[in-house]
Amino acid sequence: MKVFISHHKNDSELASKIHFQLRMQNVDAYLDVFDNALVSDSKLLTEHLKDLVRNSSDILVVMSESTRTSWWVPFEIGIAANQDLPTVTYLQDYVSLPEYLDYWPRLKSMNDIPKYVKARNERMQEVRKNLDSSVEMFSRRISSTEQFYSRLKAAL
């Protein structure tokens, strides 16, 4: 699990606390505050952010009144939505959300972060279990096909 934390620069302190809480839960998280590779060139920055979001498993959006003036937060959400990344919002002071963000789960305190991580880990385990089951079925299908080939070759 790797979480991209999207936030307005005015919310960097809260985003850092969220980053710390995720790390305490053994979750890899990206926060631009700790990124020495950030550049001021808008084209390079855009590509850098796109790569970071693409290489994340989730996006956590810090929502505050400042977010309403952000250009980058909606951009990052758009990249994540395009990839169908699981998205959660962290509401600062119960800010009212734009309608398009109302769909995703809302974290309202630091106590919600372990709940988010637990739910996400449980879902990832289910997906892994289903994948293992699919691989096993595929393997059985192959071995069944191989058995068919062997029988047919013997009969021919």
Set out the residue ranges of the language-model regions:
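C-terminal interaction surface of TIR/SEFIR-family domains
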Residues: 3, 13, 94-156
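Short low-complexity, flexible loop/linker segments enriched in glycine and/or proline
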Residues: 43-47, 76-77, 102-106
